[in-house]
Amino acid sequence: MQPYEAIEEWKPRTRLGWLVKEGKIGSLKEIFDMNMRIKEPEIVDALLGRELQHEIIDINMVQKMTDAGRITRFRVVVVVGNQNGFVGLGVGKARQLRIAVDKALADAKLNIIPVRRGCGSFECGCSEPHSIPYQVRGKAGSVDVVLKPAPKGTGLVAGDTAKVILRYAGISDIWSWSRGKTSTTINFAQAVFDALRRAYRFVSVSEWGR
């Protein structure tokens, strides 16, 4: 059963969840306008439905020492988005891969954010939301990432992990620069996501659509 097919059986646990299920809130934008926190992944399923897509960008094995000995678990990193202004990144850990994927997917939905898009390149100026409106920096662990507006047709000049996240966010043109241990996929992904989150926070919600 797909997430959007299970919404009828969903029993919300939060006030926001009930507002969404009863149709009193009809979009993610309304939620962010009211500065409300998403605490149930089903909220995202209900509002984005079949628009929501996801992709696994990293699977790794991690070990933890306990009194019972060494425990090996899967660590999965997943990106979700509608490729039109909303993206989320999540991490899940479990001894079974399927459970780790499900946890990462739920975490990504809880972390979903609106993406500030625009045309900030002086070489373009088309006013279409194909890039970002200004340069922004993100950081995670030892990794620093800088995203810069690029003219239409440039494409995503970034590492493979960044390309996936940017594509799911609905960005098609960008210049990027990074330093640190970018081979560590989870840190690189979180740094890119941090940059997009900072880009959104840089302006007020009332400025959306300008």
Give the positions of each predicted feature.
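Ribosome-associated RNA-binding proteins
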Residues: 1-210
